[in-house]
């Protein structure tokens, strides 16, 4: 599979399944998942373990890889780009995951979090919007749910030392995001109370980022 080209799909296939051996692919896949899931070890009966590791597996499905093995990906302006510094990812269901899945990933899979922040920065930049998507799908701004969850993900990662991305640019896009969707000078949203609460939290996140840089 490639979102870029047939040639990209061929390269991905040759990299992922060079031998075209079903049994070998099965063994390798099982090992990869066992390695990923073994980052957390628990004690308990088999039923409890099945429930826990099934849930842990679910946290590792998205955001999924959107770039080819050679680093090429389709940007938010529908042009092809290439990177060697991160894996471009998609399906950021921000409001669903910023309180739970992403704080967990900062502990067990910080590289994934770093990938996602780089991807969000690229979307804000290549789209020309200059702010983060709330719920991203195939580099599109769906606008689903409320608040500014990407700002929270960025703040949590930055405070934990996950910073392998253009920090100044990431913070500027965070500022733009809360200015575009936020309480701003009024200090509240005239709509639902839940919006005021979410926006107040993202304002605090931006303030935390700026204080971390003595700004």
How would you name each of these model-derived features?
Residues 22, 26, 30, 45-49, ...:
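Solvent-exposed, acidic/flexible segments
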């Amino acid at each position: 599979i490639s979102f870029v080209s047939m040639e990209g799909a061929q390269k991905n296939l040759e990299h992922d399944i060079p031998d075209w051996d079903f049994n070998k692919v099965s063994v390798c896949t099982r090992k990869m998942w066992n390695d990923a899931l073994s980052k957390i070890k628990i004690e308990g009966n088999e039923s409890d373990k099945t429930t826990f590791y099934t849930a842990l597996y679910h946290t590792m499905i998205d955001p999924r890889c959107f770039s080819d093995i050679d680093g090429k990906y389709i940007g938010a302006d529908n042009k092809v780009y290439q990177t060697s510094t991160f894996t471009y990812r998609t399906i950021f269901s921000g409001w669903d995951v910023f309180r739970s899945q992403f704080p967990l990933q900062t502990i067990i899979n910080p590289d994934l979090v770093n990938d996602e922040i780089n991807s969000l920065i690229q979307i804000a930049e290549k789209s020309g919007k200059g702010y983060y998507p709330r719920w991203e799908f195939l580099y599109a701004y769906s606008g689903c749910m409320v608040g500014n969850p990407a700002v929270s993900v960025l703040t949590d990662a930055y405070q934990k030392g996950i910073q392998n991305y253009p920090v100044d640019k990431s913070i500027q896009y965070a500022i733009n995001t809360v200015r575009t969707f936020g309480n701003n000078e009024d200090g509240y949203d005239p709509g639902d109370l839940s919006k005021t609460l979410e926006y107040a939290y993202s304002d605090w996140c931006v303030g935390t980022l700026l204080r971390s840089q003595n700004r």
